[in-house]
Structures are given as C-alpha cells and as structure tokens.
Amino acid sequence: MFSDICDYYVDFGYKKSHQRYKSISKITIHHMGANSNPIYCAKWHRDDKDVSSNYYIGSDGSIVGGVSEDRRAWSTGDEDNDQSAINIEVANCSRGPEWSVSYEALVSLLALCIDICKRYNFRLNWTGDEYGSLTTHNMFAQTICPGPYLMNWMKDISLNVNKYLEEYK
C-alpha cells in the first residue's frame, strides 16, 4: 500500500523488509546524501544495499514508493522505530556540511507527511528525540542523516503539518 500522491513505484516485494507488528504512529526523515534520482535510489536500495525506505523524494518533488506501508523498511537500524514509522528519504541539492534540499522536495515532504498523518490518524510531535512522532535517522544511529538543513526544518514541518490537519479536518 502506498500514498495516492506517489508519482512512481519501485516494487520491493518482500525484499529488505519485514511484516509490521505495530501500528503506524510516526514518520522518520532521512536524506539521500546526494542529489539522486529517487527511482535510482530506490532501485539501488532494493538491489544492492541492506537498507530500504517506504518513500523516496527527488529534488524535483517527485515521490517514489519503495517498501509498501504494510511492511517495515530497514531504515534506521532500530527495529522498534521502524516497526511504527513510515521512513522517507529526501534527495539533497547540495553536499555537506549543510546537505540542503530543494523547495520542491520540502513541499512534497510536507504533502506526504500530511497524507500519512491523515490516513493513520496521528499528529506530528517534534520533541527532538526518539520519543516524538517525527523522528530522524540520527536519533537511532551514529550518522549525520538527515543533515543540518533538514534538522533545522523539523519543528516547522511538525507545526505546518499539524496546522493543515487542524484547518482541513
């Protein structure tokens, strides 16, 4: 199962995932670490890496479904988080130290977060740690992911998603 706002899909089937045993109640944000085409990144994860994600967002704002939402992606290295989270990879439009993302990617990230929260009936709560319903990869592993640029957007993402959900009940 994927969001209706997906532009493309890369069928992972049962690869690089496990069945969920928890309900979806959070979103975890990642960065690609490159300005990768989201279809290419999803296929690379599916075919060559021991990682996966539910969604991939390109710098052009395109959204690609990877691991179906009814399955747990291998994203953070923390099974408990991945069991309850939808994991989203976002392409970077610049490299470090900022690892910025494009305006189009941010707009698509907001739209996807809104859609997920609506369908699973939860609000985003940015606490800055693993206990919120909006989390980041670096909360579970020694990594810079999702990078300073997206980290600086987390509170605003949470506030804007919740504002939209409240206004358009």
At which residue positions do the language-model features occur?
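Cell-envelope and extracellular/periplasmic
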Residues: 33, 84-98, 139
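N-terminal catalytic cores of peptidoglycan-degrading enzymes
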Residues: 1-82, 145, 168
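Structural preference for beta-strand elements that scaffold enzyme active sites
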Residues: 26, 85-87, 133-135
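Short, charged/polar low-complexity linear motifs in solvent-exposed/disordered segments
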Residues: 81-84, 160-161
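Basic/polar, cationic surfaces and motifs that engage anionic cell-wall
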Residues: 1-21, 94-169
